[in-house]
């Protein structure tokens, strides 16, 4: 029953946004563990500023027009108890942005487990994945090669994937990541 409610709610919001935009939206699912910086990244893109955020309980949704695409970005909370609800946001997803706290080496196994779980979902079959390696402004941030190795991304053969180092605070790498998403979707 709860599952049906969340599916209906997600469809409702997508349809409402489509009416206002006058065209079909591209649906982007932005997920990652708690504290990775998903909401900070989303609001930086939408508003151009760093906004003080609190942990997302549920979701944030924003429509961003970028590279001739109207992207409805669903930022879903990453706390352990909320991750079970991610599946309710899969339907109709065109791309996944998985935000990683690249300073949190202790949780990379947990990140890998969540990405591996996404890869086996029928509703996400073949859907491209952008890994935004956030918090690159910190001295102890993992580089791209370390992220790729920690998450065993080279084993992914059934879809496009890309790792973009970024810093939500400094705006570094965010637009390059969204360029990759936009170009990949435009070339489908």
Swiss-Prot record:
Chief location of this protein within or outside the cell: Golgi
Q: What InterPro entries does the record tag this protein with? A: P-loop_NTPase, Small_GTP-bd, Small_GTPase_ARF, Small_GTPase_ARF/SAR
Q: Mind telling me which CDD domains this protein's record contains?
A: Arf_Arl (cd00878)
Q: Where in the cell is it found?
A: Golgi apparatus
Which terms are listed as keywords in the entry?
A: ER-Golgi transport, Golgi apparatus, GTP-binding, Nucleotide-binding, Protein transport, Transport
- Protein name (Swiss-Prot/TrEMBL): ADP-ribosylation factor K
Q: What organism does the record attribute this protein to?
A: Dictyostelium discoideum (Social amoeba)
* Record: residues binding GTP: 34-40, 75-79, 134-137
């Amino acid at each position: 029953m709860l599952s049906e409610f969340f599916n209906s709610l997600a469809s409702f919001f997508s349809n409402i946004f489509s009416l206002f935009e006058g065209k079909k939206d591209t649906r982007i699912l932005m997920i990652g563990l708690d504290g990775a910086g998903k909401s900070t990244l989303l609001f930086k893109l939408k508003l151009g500023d760093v906004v003080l955020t609190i942990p997302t309980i549920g979701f944030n949704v924003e429509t961003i027009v970028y590279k001739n695409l109207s992207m409805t970005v669903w930022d879903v909370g990453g706390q352990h108890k909320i991750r079970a609800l991610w599946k309710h946001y899969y339907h109709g997803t065109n791309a996944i942005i998985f935000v990683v706290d690249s300073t949190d080496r202790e949780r990379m196994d947990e990140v890998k487990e969540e990405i591996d779980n996404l890869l086996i979902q029928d509703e996400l079959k073949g859907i491209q994945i952008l890994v935004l390696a956030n918090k690159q402004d910190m001295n102890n941030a993992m580089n791209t090669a370390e992220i790729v190795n920690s998450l065993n991304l080279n084993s992914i053969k059934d879809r496009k994937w890309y790792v973009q180092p970024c810093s939500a605070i400094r705006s570094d790498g965010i637009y390059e990541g969204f360029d990759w998403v936009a170009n990949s979707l435009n070339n489908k």
